[in-house]
Amino acid sequence: MSDVENQPFFNIQRIYLKDLSLEQPNSPAIFLEQEMPAVEVEVDVKAERLADTVYEIVVAGTVTAKVREKVAFLVEAKQAGIFDIRNIPAEQIDPLCGIACPTILFPYLRSNIADSITRAGFPPIHLAEINFQALYEQRLAEIAQQQGGAPNGTTLN
């Protein structure tokens, strides 16, 4: 094998909107409300190996806006990407799928959610950038805690 064939390789094969749902259970009455809605945002990342070197990464986002406990709108979206990852050490694959790939996908998700909200007749909502490294590290800590080990090696009771 040549050195070129052994070089680390990372390629975006495709980026696509996998799922999009918008609900307005209280329209048109909700448009008469004068109060600003309270907005909640949830983001999650999933990775699935499709082939030996091919991975699908999905960044899911849910945005819920409520005015006095009445839902103004609920948007759920999944932005996905197919990535070809070769000649990368095994211990670096998980962080690549959990940090780098979601960072690439998130601007697409943010744009699709914002577009859906404005097309539904609501003022635009701009989702802040997400630190996927912090999210990834938090997920690792939760997994370690569920497995019964604390970060310093002690067992939690």
Curated annotation (Swiss-Prot):
Primary site of residence: cytoplasm
Annotated localization: Cytoplasm
Q: Which InterPro entries match?
A: SecB (IPR003708), SecB-like_sf (IPR035958)
User: Which BP terms in the Gene Ontology apply to this protein?
Assistant: protein folding; protein tetramerization; protein transport
Question: Which keywords, in A-to-Z order, does the entry hold?
Answer: Chaperone, Cytoplasm, Protein transport, Translocation, Transport
One GO CC annotation: cytoplasm
What GO annotations for molecular function exist for this entry? Answer: unfolded protein binding
Family indicated by similarity: Belongs to the SecB family.
User: Function of this protein?
Assistant: One of the proteins required for the normal export of preproteins out of the cell cytoplasm. It is a molecular chaperone that binds to a subset of precursor proteins, maintaining them in a translocation-competent state. It also specifically binds to its receptor SecA.
UniProt name for this protein: Protein-export protein SecB
